[in-house]
Amino acid sequence: MLKGEKVVLAYSGGLDTSVIIPWLKENYECEIIAVCVDVGQREDLRYIKDKALASGASKVYIEDVKEEFVKDYIFPTLKAGAIYEGKYLLGTSMARPLIAKKLVEIAHKEGAKAIAHGATGKGNDQVRFEVSIRALDPSIKIIAPWRIWELKSREDEIEYAKKKGIPIPVTKEKIYSVDSNLWHVSHEGGDLEDPWNEPKSDIYDIVTPPEKVSDKPEYVYIEFEKGIPVKVNGKTLSPVKLIEELNEIGGRNGVGIVDLVENRLVGMKSRGVYETPAGTLLYIAHRELEYLVLDKETMRFKELVAQKYADLVYNGLWFSPLKTALDAFIDETQKNVTGVVRLKLYKGNVINAGAKSPYSLYNEEFATFGKDEVYNQKDAEGFINLFGLSLKIRALMEMGRKDMDEAVGR
């Protein structure tokens, strides 16, 4: 048991973690150290601190890690081009290992024997938190109330919170599980659990629905250095400010809405509606620049790496040796990913409107259909003969077998 011991709680102030503080105190008789990791969630963190203390926490940490989140988690994933199942830009997945890292650091600082989290027993986050914590310190005990308590639904949690006098910002009539950070906002649960239901227009927090945006297109210029975005519209910005600026630009143009039924790590499908305006712009711009500067074989292999990288991040394996090794490969591919991309934004659409790089492998003189000295069109005949040789041999062999069959009357 943990009677009298310290337990570090990953605290968000939302429904799940709001009821965990009194529950832990009732069932473990322990001291609660609430830790809110600021990854850019759009909430009043002063209110969260007061709420945690009022709920029974003895101490509250609010850790601002936005800069670290962008530089050490978002940008490496962007450079990898990692997208889960073709749509999901991994907003929640990237934040969880960083949160776990801070929980472990504070547990060490406070001498806590255990870490608790509010992830459900059906979701991916329980895996991400616990695998990350164990990768960093396997001696720390982990408490996952959702897997052991008597509360079986969000409605049960609401009733428990009311009984304990804990204010919560949801009702039984409109229950969405919302996760937000600097990179994205995700919406799950409620009427979204039926994939036939279209998301209500008022669900969106940072993206204006495309049908409500201006009829005029807007252009945005994004500049990269070695795969890292550094400027927007010619202005150098810090990593955090750059994401915020692109969220504003993309959001007002209806960019970045994704509705996805995804395959969870734990084996079931779930539906999520995501808002990722800055991420959408950055992924498209980064890819357009790679088209210019990467050779064919590197680009094709990097596509395979991107898929594996996305799976590792989604599955909570951020601190795995393989992910570290893939980072080394990706960094090598990004040495020449420097240049400017111009994007045209119109009612939720993002259209490439130009790209340039000092390391571009595209040469207009080589690519032209006119006369040139580098490419001799007569050379194409020999290339075609060799390239298609295996098919030619196959056809000749089949013709020979057919003639033989006819000769023997088969």
From Swiss-Prot:
Residues annotated to bind L-citrulline: 88, 93, 124, 128, 177, 186, 262, 274
Main location: cytoplasm
Superkingdom of origin organism: Bacteria
Keyword ATP-binding in record: yes
Lineage: Bacteria, Bacillati, Bacillota, Clostridia, Thermoanaerobacterales
Cellular localization per UniProt: Cytoplasm
Primary enzyme class: ligase
Keywords (A to Z) from UniProt: Amino-acid biosynthesis, Arginine biosynthesis, ATP-binding, Cytoplasm, Ligase, Nucleotide-binding
Family the entry assigns: Belongs to the argininosuccinate synthase family. Type 1 subfamily.
Gene Ontology MF terms: argininosuccinate synthase activity; ATP binding
PANTHER family: ARGININOSUCCINATE SYNTHASE (PTHR11587:SF2)
Enzyme Commission numbers on file: 6.3.4.5
Biological process annotations from GO: argininosuccinate metabolic process; L-arginine biosynthetic process; urea cycle
Cross-referenced Pfam families: Arginosuc_syn_C, Arginosuc_synth
Binding sites annotated in the UniProt record for L-aspartate: 120, 124-125
Entry protein name: Argininosuccinate synthase
Organism: Caldanaerobacter subterraneus subsp. tengcongensis (strain DSM 15242 / JCM 11007 / NBRC 100824 / MB4) (Thermoanaerobacter tengcongensis)
Positions annotated to bind ATP: 10-18, 118
Gene name for this UniProt entry: argG
Pathway(s) per entry: Amino-acid biosynthesis; L-arginine biosynthesis; L-arginine from L-ornithine and carbamoyl phosphate: step 2/3
Subunit architecture: Homotetramer.
Record-level GO cellular component terms: cytoplasm
Reactions that this protein is recorded to catalyse: L-citrulline + L-aspartate + ATP = 2-(N(omega)-L-arginino)succinate + AMP + diphosphate + H(+)
